[in-house]
Every structure is written in structure tokens, then in C-alpha cells.
Amino acid sequence: LVLAVVAIGAAIVMGGGNPASLIDVPSILVVFGGTAGALIAAYPLGSILKIHTVVLKAVFGSAPDPAQTIKDLVKFAEIARREGILSLENHVEDMKDPFIVRGIKMAVDGTDPELIRTILDTELEALMDRHAGGKAILDAAGRMAPAFGMIGTLMGLIFMLQNMDDPSAIGPGMAVALITTMYGAIIANVITGPIAEKLGARDSEEVLVKTVIIAGVMSIQSGDNPRVVESKLLTYLPPAQRAAIEQAA
């Protein structure tokens, strides 16, 4: 995102252009205000107001590490095998992922395995729904912004054609008219589009890790040998990453 902005700015300067000439308040109102208004009409206001948390997590959040998660689960399986599953209650502080904590606590409490799976699956589905909702808003903004950019351009052309008696104003008028199209394209292709794609990728990563956790918790509760737990969980990883973990072990 930052690289794209820097590249565009550098291209403007290197081309001899003045970045300040690309700032037009009426165009900003048409594109940004129009897009915001359309989003408010299409989605609940609460969801829109929370979109910044989704954006920050997608851009600045650290990606979950499935390999480390597997190592942690295998370690907990070894403890449960050696000291009994109840001993895991003394190692809750070592569990970095709250999802693991919830699963292990239910296993320690003797909760029915099917109920544990149902609860964890429901939480995973809720996570996926939240991510899908955030991505849908960003995708919608990416579709709407170019449309409002075109609306602004058409408005500018109409105003320009109404003043055809002054030929000297045609060039500047056309330039201002096209600025709104540029704003819409930038919003769609530099801001909302890339962030939505990254959110989709981050969602896949989190779903993978939580799927691994569910499988690990169920395997630990059933009393599987730690080697069996590791073998089960490694099947979720790509072959190259799986081989690297096996060699390290």
C-alpha cells in the first residue's frame, strides 16, 4: 500500500507535475462522500464504523504460524500423556492462543468431545463470518468508488460544456473533471482492493490455524500418542513445510 502511494507520487513528480494540482475539494466530496453514503445505505452503520479494526488487523496484524501451533499442541499432548490431561490446567499460562485455552479447558473439565467440537466449530464460523463481512464492505467500496468517480467526471463535463463560450477554460475544466475518475481508481486499486485481498488471505491463514487447533484438542482429549497427534496435524501443512518440521524434530 505504502509502496503504491510512493510510486504514484514519484511518477507525478518525475513527470514534472504538481501533486497539489491533483487535490480538488469538490471531487473529494463527490467520490469519498458518495462512496461513504452508498456504504451506509447498503450496510449497517455499526459494521462500517468497525471496519477500521478489520483494516488495521489485515495490514499490521502478524500472520498466525501453523507450524508453531502444531509444536505447542504436540508439547501439550506430551504433558497430557505423561502427567494426565488434568495437568494441562497448570500450563494454561503457556498457551498463547485463547482458542487453544478454551479448547483445552473444556477437555480438562471432561466436556463431551462432540460438544467441544461444536463449540469450537461455531466460534470458527463466527470468525469467518466477521472476516467475510469486513471483506464485503471493502469490496463494495472498491466497486462504488469508480462509479462515483465517473459520476463526478460526468458532472465536470456537463459544467464544462455549459461554458464552451470560453475556450481557455476547456482544458482546466477537463482536467478537473478527470480528477474524480482518478480518485475512484485509486480508492479501488490502491486502497480497498489490496486490503480486501489481504484480509481474505489472512482469513485463510487464521482458519487453517484454528482448524489445526480443533484437531489437536480433540486428539489430545482422546489420549492419542504425541507422535500420532503430530502426524495428524502435519497433514494440514504443505509438503515443504511439513518436511522442514519433521527434519527439525
Regions found by a protein language model. Give the residues of each.
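Large intracellular
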Residues: 10-135, 205-249
